[in-house]
């Protein structure tokens, strides 16, 4: 009976916060404590300059909710984006600490700090500083999320440092390479269905709009992207995401200015049981 009550409370919590499970960014909230999530993401770039070929990247990830404040995420990427053949590309580790929580009826506010470290064996291509397979580096940032009933709005700012051997050599690159940047994101999610929550087995339909921007600190270069997405949540534990990301403005050299993303994620509640 206690186990049933615990599961019911957790599932209701997942349902009420579904609209802040963003597709392209992380909210200030964490996955449930002592839970594990497994996720597989596919990014597809259609034929466009400069490569004029269909490129794919697959990212398996594992999320671990250590407690209500700490969360870890580890992943790897496999792709043919920087090479002709499809191969293992990178590994990374992400951690998030929620340091502020303010709860009210049908609303809450969260703030968290996050850090990420990534190693990539991909060649140094393009200006964009991305730790999702493209570059080795470090990232540190802060994120805030506000939930009002069916609407969730989130924003983040982070600093990135690219780590590549060319950073310390004496070669003169034209244009100069980018090793430092600031990332900015603004995301909004809305719970469209169900209109009334009755049971955790109801399918949720969430709509998202996200803005993602990067500004180089080494020279004047930037981009601003827009990423609408749709999300289905089944049994409050399995998520299916579909998004399309495209550039609104910018002057950075990038691998692609638009791409599709599809992902599926399964959460295993109370997988890390407390020792008695």
Placement of each model-derived feature along the sequence:
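Transmembrane beta-barrel domains of Gram-negative outer membranes and organellar outer membranes
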Residues: 18-149, 153-155, 159-164, 175-231, ...
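Covalent nucleotidyltransferase core used to form phosphodiester bonds in nucleic acids
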Residues: 167-169
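Positively charged n-region of N-terminal signal peptides that target proteins for export
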Residues: 1-4
